Design a protein with these regions (language model features):
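A metal-dependent hydrolase signature that marks the N-terminal structural subdomain at the beginning
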Residues: 1-127, 134, 138, 142, ...
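Short catalytic/ligand-binding loop motif for oxyanion handling, primarily in non-cytosolic enzymes
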Residues: 109-111, 165, 173-174
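Short pre-active-site segment immediately N-terminal to the catalytic Zn-binding motif
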Residues: 133-157, 170-175
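Post-HExxH zinc-binding segment in Zn-dependent metallohydrolases
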Residues: 176-206
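Hydrophobic, Leu/Ile/Phe/Ala-enriched alpha-helical segments that form helix-helix packing faces
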Residues: 60-68, 161, 190-194
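Aromatic-rich peripheral "rim/lid" segments of glycoside hydrolase catalytic domains that contact
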Residues: 101, 205, 209-210
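Active-site recognition of the HExxH zinc-binding catalytic motif
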Residues: 155-168, 183
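Short strand-loop junctions, especially beta-strand C-caps/beta-turns
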Residues: 105, 167-170
C-alpha cells in the first residue's frame, strides 16, 4: 500500500517456517516428489493478487541453465496467498525434498521498501528500469506489471532456488548451510546470466516503464 514502508523481501517472517533451509513443521505436507515437478496455486489473500502464473514458472525454469539437474530434490513451486511471508524455501526432512513458495503481490504495484532493501537490490531495479523516489522513510518503487513479475522471478524465485542449490550441495543435503549470502549471490549471478533469454521469452520489462 502506498504511504507506508512495506516489508522488504527478506524471505522470512514467522516461526516455525523454514529458516535458511532448516526444516519446520507447522503445515501438513503430502509428498509430491512421485508426481514430478508440480506448480500449485493458492487463492490470493484479500488485497493480494497473483502476478506470476503457473505457466510463467514453467517458462522461466526452461531458461535456467542445467535446470533438469538443479531441480533434483525439488518437489515444485507453490504460488502462495501472499499475506505472511515474502518468498520461502521449505525443506521436508522425511522425504528429503524441498519446495519454493512465491507470494501473491500485496497491495499496489507502487510500493515503498526500506532503504536497505533498495540498496541491496539497486542493480536489479536499475536493470528493470523501475522508477523510484524517497518517500515515507523509505524508497517508493513504481513497478509496472511486467517489472513486478520480473522482480519476483529474477530475484525472489532465484533467491529461494539458491537455498535449494545450497542444500543439495551440502554433504548431508539436510540444510542450506551457506544461508542468505549464498542465496543472494546465486540469484544475482543467474539473473544476469539469463537476462537476454528472459527478455526473449517474457518481453522486455523496461519498455513498460513510464
Amino acid at each position: 500500500m502506498i504511504g507506508r514502508v512495506k516489508r522488504a523481501y527478506q524471505r522470512r517472517k514467522v516461526a516455525p517456517k523454514v529458516r535458511d533451509g532448516v526444516v519446520q513443521k507447522k503445515h501438513r505436507h503430502l509428498a509430491t516428489a512421485a508426481l514430478g515437478f508440480v506448480v500449485d496455486r493458492q487463492s490470493p489473500a484479500k488485497g493480494c493478487r497473483h502476478i506470476v502464473t503457473k505457466r510463467d514458472i514453467h517458462e522461466f525454469t526452461s531458461i535456467i541453465p542445467n535446470w533438469s539437474r538443479i531441480r533434483e530434490g525439488l518437489e515444485g513451486v507453490v504460488l502462495t496467498r501472499g499475506d505472511d511471508v515474502d518468498g520461502l524455501y521449505r525443506f521436508y526432512s522425511k522425504d528429503r525434498t524441498g519446495s519454493i513458495e512465491i507470494p501473491a503481490w500485496d497491495g499496489d504495484l507502487w510500493t515503498v521498501v526500506t532503504l536497505e532493501h533498495f540498496e541491496e537490490h539497486r542493480a536489479l531495479f536499475q536493470r528493470l528500469a523501475v522508477p523510484f523516489e524517497p518517500k515515507d522513510g523509505g524508497i517508493e518503487c513504481r513497478f509496472t506489471l511486467p517489472q513486478a513479475k520480473a522482480f519476483l522471478l529474477l530475484h525472489v524465485f532465484l533467491h529461494e532456488l539458491g537455498h535449494h542449490v545450497d542444500r543439495m550441495q551440502s554433504k548431508q543435503q539436510d540444510s542450506s548451510r551457506r544461508g542468505e549470502s549464498f542465496a543472494e549471490q546465486y540469484a544475482n549471478t543467474v539473473s544476469s546470466l539469463i537476462w537476454p533469454e528472459y527478455v526473449r521469452v517474457f518481453g522486455d520489462p523496461t519498455r513498460s516503464a513510464a
